[in-house]
Each structure stands twice: as structure tokens, then as C-alpha cells.
Curated annotation (Swiss-Prot):
It comes from Bordetella parapertussis (strain 12822 / ATCC BAA-587 / NCTC 13253). Belongs to the UPF0276 family. It holds the Pfam family MbnB_TglH_ChrH. This is UPF0276 protein BPP1075. NCBIfam families: PRK05409.1 (NF003818).
Length: 289
């Protein structure tokens, strides 16, 4: 097993966190759970006021907050959307979140927005482009961001840089951190037939500032082959739990978010899963001691 990575100064506490859903707000107010942080999607709060901000203000008074962007299209050819950049900056000034993150993906082209996180070609031109976009975002905020590794379903013949190496280069050139989505690693490993543990060993693990866990769906392609989809609509798969424990053996305890964006159950069911996250983190802390 590779040596454990040394940890950077943390932004989020090395505890279990949960993605905030407005339908859980009343339950949260009635009985605030013992969690380290909540995560929100930035684009849902780029309005001046209303119930969403009242709820977020309540959370911010009680928990660490992670702001997770889904629409900047850091991997795209288009210039970054100035309105989204301004919205991120306003959120940062208003709430001083403990972490701000985005995806290694694209979602805009020729001024049109696509409601998905689409894969990029891993070549030198893309590396320069993504670095420039990360630099622009970080300069806007005045702080480093975390960049999330993607779940992918296709690979491009034009790619000549390994994804893990691409992420290493981005971290080295821009000073950004890594949001390590363990479910995405597993999904991509199954879809493309690579070794998930070997992939993890090639990542810049000392730069990991947050981990994501989520459920996935299993489908079949036109040829009948199994394809995993990063659906966020089911409990975390046992294989992903195993990979998460392996990851913690490499990184030590890291703030870990449970994501659930579809088929959302009552809060109690999600808190049971975050309890398992907390147990994994406690074991990781004991090993690190």
C-alpha cells in the first residue's frame, strides 16, 4: 500500500457531512443533527433573498458550509460566465464558506448551456484551458478551490494524458485542491475497466480537501454491457464503501459528504448513512494516531 499522504491545513472539519435538501429543513430545525458540515449547490442560491437564503443562514450559524458549483464549465472552450463568477463571489462574501468546489467537466458551448457534466479530452490544449479557467475562478474568489474528479462513460482517442496525471498537473500548476469523489472513481473504473486502487495511488492525495460518496445506477448499453451511472439516487454501494475505507487508509480522515439528489428519503435514512461515514472516519483517525 502506498504511504499515507500528509494532510494540508483543512478547510472543512474531517467529519461526516450531508448535502442540504430544503425538504429536510423543518426536521433539521426541530432536531439539529450532529454533523460536521452541509453542502449546497451554488447555483440554487444566486438570488438576492427568499426562503433559500433564510435556510442557508440558519445552517451557516450552526455548521461548516461547503459551496459546490455545477455550472461554471471549467473544462469548456467558452469563456467563463461572468454572471456565475459574480454569483460565486457574492455567496463567498455573504457566507464565508469553508470550502468552494467545482467539477472537471464542461456544460457550455457557443453560449448554450447543457444541463449535464460532460467529459473533456485529456490533451495539452485542454490542460492549458482548464488551468486558465481555474486560475480565473480562484483569482475571482481570492482563494483556492477544490476540483472534483469526474464520472465518465466515454473516452476519447485524442486523449493522450492519463486522467490521474491530468489532475496532478492541474493541482501543481494552479494550486487548487482535489475533491475526491470515490463513487466517481468506482463508476469510471467499472465503465472503462481500470484498477480503481491503482488510479487512487496516482492522484495528488495530499491535496484532497473533501471526499464525496454517493449511490449509482446500473444500466446496459446498446451491446448489453453493464454501464454504471453516477445517479445520486440510491444508497452508497458496498463496493464504494470498501473503496472509501481504502482511500482513508491513504489519506487519513478527510471531510466526507454523503450526496443524495434523487429518490430522496427521510432525513433519518440519510443520517444512518452519515453514521457509517463517521464510523469509517473514526477508524481512520485511530489508524493515524
Amino acid at each position: 500500500m502506498p504511504a499515507r499522504a500528509s494532510r494540508p491545513a483543512p478547510g472543512l472539519p474531517a467529519r461526516a457531512g450531508l448535502g442540504f435538501k430544503p425538504e429536510h429543513y423543518a426536521t433539521l430545525v426541530e432536531q439539529p443533527p450532529d454533523l460536521g458540515f452541509f453542502e449546497i449547490h451554488a447555483e440554487n442560491y444566486m438570488v438576492p433573498g427568499g426562503p433559500a437564503h433564510a435556510q442557508l443562514a440558519w445552517l451557516r450559524e450552526r455548521y461548516a458550509i461547503s459551496v459546490h458549483g455545477v455550472g461554471l464549465s471549467l473544462g469548456g472552450h467558452d469563456p467563463l460566465d461572468a454572471r456565475l463568477l459574480a454569483g460565486h463571489r457574492q455567496l463567498q462574501r455573504r457566507y464565508a464558506p469553508d470550502s468552494i468546489s467545482e467539477h472537471l467537466a464542461w456544460s457550455r458551448h457557443d453560449g448554450r448551456y447543457f444541463n449535464d457534466l460532460l467529459p473533456i479530452v485529456y490533451d495539452d490544449a485542454a490542460l492549458r484551458r482548464v488551468c486558465a479557467h481555474i486560475d480565473q475562478f480562484q483569482q475571482c474568489l481570492g482563494q483556492p478551490i477544490l476540483l472534483e474528479n469526474p464520472a465518465t462513460y466515454v473516452r476519447f482517442e485524442a486523449s493522450h494524458i492519463d486522467e490521474a496525471q491530468f489532475l496532478c498537473e492541474l493541482v501543481a500548476r494552479t494550486g487548487c485542491g482535489l475533491l475526491l469523489d470515490v463513487n466517481n472513481v468506482y463508476v469510471s473504473a467499472v465503465n472503462h475497466g481500470f484498477d480503481a486502487r491503482a488510479y487512487l495511488a496516482r492522484l495528488p492525495l495530499a491535496a484532497v480537501g473533501e471526499i464525496h460518496l454517493a449511490g449509482h445506477a446500473r444500466q446496459r448499453d446498446a451491446h448489453g454491457r453493464a454501464v454504471l451511472i453516477d445517479s445520486h439516487d440510491a444508497p452508497v454501494d458496498e463496493a464504494v464503501w470498501d473503496l472509501y475505507e481504502y482511500t482513508l487508509a491513504l489519506t487519513g480522515p478527510v471531510a466526507t459528504l454523503l450526496e443524495r439528489d434523487g429518490n430522496i428519503p427521510p432525513l433519518a435514512a440519510l443520517l444512518a448513512e452519515t453514521g457509517r461515514v463517521a464510523a469509517c472516519l473514526a477508524r481512520g483517525l485511530a489508524l493515524a494516531a
